[in-house]
């Protein structure tokens, strides 16, 4: 018997075992689910150090260097945090029928319903000072409707159980577990979780941590490549699919590949007749609002923007890809120079993700003026800046293709004043740049508080058609908080999925969301642990993970000590 035949039989067995437990999962009551969450939290706490160390080895990072902190942060910390968000939400479902919304529920002048969802706990206020998050609902949702849009699956007693295939992302190791947990506890699905080949070495650790679900037959974890993924996508016992990847991957799943796939897409004839959701790529903009910035402001925001690029060696769908500036702003050149300085001071990283060298070469061949920074080894790429890309350029690779490596472009828009610039910048982001996943808007406090300019900034926040709009810091916060929905702006279709269809995380279980809006201070304190020059990030992020595993006032001093040594 061939190896592929054995593998196929294992995949079929996993699908059959899950299908047999679909209805049983539907019958698991909320108290049992809370108990499962507690078991999962203990399981992920046990594997946290091994998980972080394994990914650091893949990425070639020294565990004793500050940059190692990011793998604690975007790995076990985020999953433990999300489990706590889910637990609180389920307690709300048990006690009142729906998760408790921690902040006020308001309406915008146009009637759109907005729910303040963060901070939720005392720990949120201590660890994320100055950070506030809202969920903006679909315009048709009213205040009276809102409660009915939460936790619908916990009130639907008629729908049959279903199996969801989760195709995990290969770039951020927490994506797969987070998506699996979303599908289990928010959508009421049993889950067949296939790891991406890049991080399939984590399968034994995830099986250990998620054993409470596996032992009860509600989760199966499998590995394999494209052939195994295709087999599962077409499997008759798989009812729906959620994928993290590129738009091309989504289209291949739904319509197939080659000429036949292109023809099916054009004719609207999908290859598979099952729902496919996904979080796909994005050319993520950083929209800079002109202001009277000091040299310290420029240095801070340069580090802020560079940190959005170099995290995970640039292999993030939410990495900074296009910096948008006002052509007439006196600080434009100074900000670019500060970005250059920070890139030059940042050690290059292993380009571990498949295709990185080819993508980088494609961009620099299109832009020979690209500026390279660092002294990369043979398995590394230089940090790369392409400044001054004409904003009206047609078929511009920097605007239409996600680089997915350590490369960022900059463009400038002509406008007579800040208000006009913001209108142009919003239209440019919405209509020219590929994708609708996330955008960061950087504005200093004085500008934001100016009566006329502040209104223009708020109009920009409202008009940006992105699933996450973050003011002043990396929009990846929307991925990390867990309580906010993460996904593309609604409206994409299977034949043109853009940055994706549907949302994940979304711990408060809203069904009718338009976007998340996150607001932070222009300059944060304490210094953000994801900043590239944080001097104790590896210690701090390990302590944060320990704290998230077992929160207590007794553990707080150790976190504070490392936070203040940034």
Positions of PLM-derived features:
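N-terminal Rossmann-like NAD(P)+-binding subdomain of aldehyde/semialdehyde dehydrogenases
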Residues: 1-150, 196-200, 209-214, 557, ...
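C-terminal core of ALDH-fold dehydrogenases
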Residues: 35, 378, 422-535
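Short loop-to-beta-strand entry elements in the cores of soluble alpha/beta enzymes
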Residues: 37, 187-198, 218, 272-291, ...
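Active-site-adjacent "gating/activation" loops or surface patches in catalytic cores
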Residues: 130-174, 178, 185
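PLP-dependent aminotransferase-like
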Residues: 142, 163, 175-227
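Conserved NAD(P)+-binding/catalytic subdomain of aldehyde/semialdehyde dehydrogenases
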Residues: 163, 212-322, 327, 491-493
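Terminal end segments
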Residues: 197, 206, 536-566
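NAD(P)-dependent aldehyde/semialdehyde dehydrogenase
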Residues: 291, 311, 317, 325-437, ...
